[in-house]
């Protein structure tokens, strides 16, 4: 019997394929199944011997999978998949609609408790790694301000939201941080910066033939939780140009905390940054690390939804507590 953590992937897009690659770098994990809405016979995985199962048959895999990593989009997939799968499996997901995290957590929590499973939600880099750094820096510098900047890079969640607009064939969205706002945040002066002042959003959209471009642009710019709070530019281009100039998926960003200690005379700036060649592959690597934590928590008898705030760092590592103290402390 295998002692490896048996992982399933639900959704075989950019994140799903990234998870498959990340599993290859984690010897204590193995991929046993990919779940898809497509005809399973048309899906070719990178790993030999992996079952491809239609998502409607997920329940048949309950005894074969330790942790299911949900790789759907946050706009419409995960609000349904999250609770549905949490009742059947221990799950990890990258739900990233910040404004809706509390209600999503509650829905997944109820389902996970019903199924006696562990579900860690909103895992990735933001929410995820950036969230943890916001918490650490705020706890250390309680008198201060924090600032989060994303980009320049392609946002998967916002690109997914664009592609779901009626009349859109394909699209990518770049998040662009303001250099002036970043410099002000790093200065230690604790400026007040609005959402609109910190970033702009630029969309490259391929419209379907005959689609109403004005309606598409209006829908995108007015989309709540995604574009309505930002200065957004919508560029209509051909599929060929999108494929040629916008096929890579770089991203990154900064979490900055500026605060004071003593009697306010000493200023401090904490900064955490990421520069990513592949947003989906990095996100997937975080998901796999948290799958290890979910597996361990479930083995210890825990259940319900968790966020990255609830997970002790040592649970993410394949190393023993002794190894961690010796090598990293």
Identify what each model region corresponds to.
Residues 129-145, 160-170, 293:
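Oxidoreductase and adenylate-handling cofactor-binding alpha/beta cores
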Residues 15:
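Hydrophobic/small residue at the entry helix of a nucleotide-binding pocket
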Residues 12:
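Glycine-rich Rossmann-fold phosphate-binding loop(s) that bind the pyrophosphate
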Residues 7-9, 70:
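Hydrophobic Val/Ile/Leu positions in short beta-strands of Rossmann-like dinucleotide-binding domains
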Residues 95-119:
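Rossmann-fold NAD(P)-binding glycine/threonine-rich loop
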Residues 6, 18, 25-56, 154-291:
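C-terminal substrate-binding/catalytic lobe of Rossmann-fold NAD(P)-dependent oxidoreductases
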Residues 58-67, 75-94:
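Rossmann-fold NAD(P) dinucleotide-binding segment
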Residues 268-329:
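NAD(P)-dependent Rossmann-like dehydrogenase/reductase catalytic/cofactor-binding core
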